[in-house]
Design a protein with these regions (language model features):
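Accessory alpha-helical DNA-binding modules that contact the DNA backbone or grooves
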Residues: 37-38, 49, 53-120, 125-157, ...
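Duplex nucleic acid-engaging cores and interfaces of nucleic-acid transaction enzymes
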Residues: 56-59, 66-326, 332-420, 424-431, ...
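Long, charge-rich intrinsically disordered scaffolds of nucleic-acid metabolism proteins
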Residues: 103, 409, 415, 420-490, ...
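Structural detector for short beta-strands of small beta-barrel domains
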Residues: 648-662, 700-702
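Short aromatic-glycine-enriched beta-strand elements
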Residues: 662-667, 674, 712-714
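OB-fold (S1/OB) nucleic-acid-binding surfaces
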Residues: 667-683
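Short nucleic-acid-contacting surface segments enriched for D/E, G, S/T with interspersed K/R
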Residues: 687-701
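OB-fold/S1-family single-stranded nucleic acid-binding modules
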Residues: 710-722
Length: 722
């Protein structure tokens, strides 16, 4: 019964903390414990959750997991202290009421098994009674009292040694007091300073950390990216980083708390013990705790930015139905070419040498013109790596000789080389060279960014900030969640999807994804969703979790094309029948007209299906193959080129946001280097974070603010330059 009550109390805390209703929190936890996935709950259990989205559901589950860990630790600490016979009712209550793991550890600290410290050695020498006597603040002279504790057998040779031992005991007592540590932690964070100085300037060849060579900032004001920059500089042995606490204020606080009689002769010795206790035992551990907390906050921010950037990258609109010529640029080894048809099938692989040192420019031009004509190429995708701008100039020249309308686009090729050398790429294209696979990947990225990018480790897609300096476990969890959410929001064509894409579908493991592809290759395309029940290791629960996200576009049942879950098929058929329609009318204009006239609340009462689910069903019936990505702005198509020398201050340009960081956004305006729009130039209004204004893949209007031709840098502004 106590466990049930405790769960309910924790849920109430969660409700208060996150601002959701008790019903929402309870249902999310219950549904998860029953084996339902986050995408499934978000999509198909809206009535239960009050239409919470994936991010909100995850926030509840993460906080709940922390609370469970906290409760487990409390129980363990209570047991450990109890076994020592030192658990009082008051201490038990303090532990039970703790809301953070740090508070529990502070309370447990005095009872922890300690390695031999100065205090434990002093206690072994029988000096604890002297320490207790000093804290009574009697009128007697401590030096005289200490004589009683001289003991050659216990290696206490003098009164001074006895007093020193007693002070060591008092110092540890102060260090172990949870309320003191908590106050010191808070005041250090509120009034302390983050300081960095140069340690190994010769190692900082590019002067990356120059601003931190002599740097101070209040702890409360240090922004996440500076915390991570200083951490990295310290790790590389270039910087010396420390926390400077308000020492005098802390010592005054401890003196007032511990010394009850300043006139007593004991006060002097206790004061020395206080200073030693703080400087030797508390200061450095509080500094570690604060820096750990700052780092964790900074990591969360870096992971959040990376996750948002990745989400926007994955959800870029696909270029459907286009034959694409993809170019993976290079100098010496030549530009690799691939032509992929509108389904992503590879039609042609080639190589050209338009650049030095080989430079067969005319041959390259003739070959590209021939390819465009032969395969009726509609779009050219150029990777943005080495030799990208020179290749762009070459393609612009080629396009001047092309009669039909062909556009080109610069594609972010980050991670393409990682993918092309992977086992997955070797499996997919066993007969292609690494660079040829890379060219195919670039072309397919343009056609369907999501389907192609899931094949790459999310950390390699080039939209992170300090991703190598954060907790890799936490980063992987967050990025996997982003990919899963994107894949399930879009839905997957089960007859064309790769294992890499299928493994992110709600409920599916990599093994089951492989089994689906193997079955498809063996027996041909799936014609209805129910056929997936025959897949090895795809049981009833897995089927329930995954099937709504898997689409069969040319199947026997038109509902299998939609995001409607089969559990609702009977209700859908009854709904259509009541309107004089059938499932064969799905996606037809007459069905759209009739459904738009439907009164949702009335229909909900008649069918017993919740309103949010009904809205989703009607949307799916009207637009069965709707892709949420189609509603986003299309990538920026190009026909001409810009050079750095062409730019003038105040020039208005259109560009694509390539990366968003704490201090601004990098925008590709068609010159060699992406230009930086500093956070201060994003909007006339105050901008808390660049992500509030821009996102990866977004097309933005910018003005040239400053050009540094020497360093090849461009400063841009989203505010008109006067």
């Amino acid at each position: 019964m106590e466990m049930v009550d405790n769960r309910q109390a924790l849920m109430k805390m969660l409700v208060k903390e996150l601002g959701f209703s008790e019903k929402q929190v309870r249902h999310v936890i219950q549904l998860t414990e029953e084996g339902n996935t986050v995408p499934f709950i978000a999509r198909y259990r809206k009535e239960w959750t009050g239409s919470l989205d994936e991010v909100q559901i995850r926030a509840i589950l993460e906080r709940w997991q922390y609370m469970m860990q906290l409760e487990d630790r409390k129980e363990e600490v209570i047991r450990l202290i109890g076994e020592k016979g030192k658990l009082t009712g008051e201490l038990r209550l303090q532990i039970v009421k703790a809301t953070k793991l740090q508070e529990v550890e502070d309370l447990y600290r005095p009872y922890k098994e300690k390695r031999r410290t100065k205090a434990t050695i002093a206690k072994e020498k029988g000096l604890e009674p002297l320490a207790e006597w000093l804290l009574l603040y009697k009128k007697e002279d401590p030096a005289k009292k200490a004589v009683e504790f001289i003991n050659a057998e216990k290696e206490v040779q003098s009164a001074e040694e006895a007093l020193q031992g007693a002070q060591d005991i008092i110092a540890e007592m102060i260090s172990d007091e949870a309320t003191y540590r908590s106050w010191i932690r808070n005041i250090t964070f509120r009034k302390g300073i983050m300081s960095s100085s140069v340690k190994g300037e010769e190692k900082d060849e590019k002067n990356i950390y120059e601003m931190y060579y002599s740097y101070e900032e209040p702890l409360q004001k240090v922004v996440p990216h500076r915390v991570l920059a200083m951490n990295r500089g310290e790790k590389e042995d270039i910087l010396r980083v420390s926390v400077v606490p308000p020492v005098d204020e802390i010592l005054n606080f401890l003196n007032k708390k511990v010394i009850r009689d300043n006139d007593s002769k004991s006060a002097h010795y206790v004061q020395l013990a206080i200073e030693d206790g703080y400087k030797r035992l508390i200061q450095s551990s509080i500094e570690r705790e604060i820096r750990k907390e700052l780092t964790e906050t900074a990591e969360e921010q870096a992971i959040h930015i990376f996750s948002e950037n990745l989400r926007n990258l994955l959800l870029q609109p696909p270029m459907k139905g286009k034959v694409v010529l993809a170019v993976d640029p290079a100098y010496r080894t030549g530009c690799k070419l691939s032509v992929v048809d509108d389904t992503g099938k590879v039609l042609h692989i080639d190589v050209i040498y338009p650049h030095p040192p080989v430079r067969k420019y005319d041959d390259a031009k003739t070959k590209v013109l021939s390819i465009i004509d032969k395969y009726q190429v509609e779009m050219i995708a150029i990777g943005n790596g080495t030799a990208s701008r020179e290749t762009e100039e070459f393609i612009v020249d080629v396009l001047q000789s092309v009669k039909q309308e062909v556009f080109y686009i610069i594609v972010n090729e980050a991670g393409a080389s990682v993918y092309s050398a992977s086992d997955l790429a070797r499996e997919e294209f066993p007969n292609l060279q690494v660079e040829e696979r890379s060219a195919v990947s670039i072309g397919r990225r343009l056609q369907d960014p999501l389907a192609e990018l899931v094949k790459i480790d999310p950390k390699s897609v080039g939209v992170g900030q300090y991703q190598h300096d954060v907790s890799q476990k936490r980063l992987n969890e967050s990025l996997t969640f982003v990919v899963e959410t994107a894949v399930n929001q879009v839905g997957v064509n089960v007859n064309t999807a790769s294992v890499a894409l299928l493994q992110y579908v709600s409920g599916l493991s990599k093994t089951v994804a492989k089994n689906i592809v193997a079955k498809r290759e063996e027996d041909g395309k799936f014609t209805k969703r129910t056929e997936l029940k025959k897949i090895p290791r795809l049981g009833a629960k897995t089927y329930e979790q995954c099937i709504g996200f898997l689409r069969i576009l040319e199947g026997a049942n038109p509902l299998d094309r939609t995001g409607i879950h089969p559990e609702q098929y009977k209700n859908v058929e009854l709904l259509l029948k009541s309107l004089g329609l059938s499932i064969d009318d799905v996606g037809q204009p007459q069905l759209q007209k009739r459904l738009e006239e439907v009164e949702i609340s009335k229909l909900s009462q008649e069918t017993g299906v919740g309103e949010p689910t009904l809205v989703d069903i009607i949307d799916a019936l009207i637009s069965p193959e709707r892709d949420m990505r189609d509603e986003l702005p299309k990538p920026l198509l190009k026909k001409g080129i810009l050079k750095l020398e062409d730019l003038k201050r105040g020039m208005e340009l259109e560009g694509t946001v390539r990366n968003v960081v704490d201090f601004g956004a990098f925008v590709d305006v068609g010159v060699k280097q992406d230009g930086l729009v500093h956070i201060s130039k994003l909007s006339k209004q105050f901008v808390k974070h660049p992500l509030d204004v821009v996102s990866v893949g977004r097309i933005v209007k910018v003005w040239v603010d400053d050009i540094d031709t020497k360093k090849g840098r461009v400063a841009l502004s989203m505010l008109p330059i006067e």
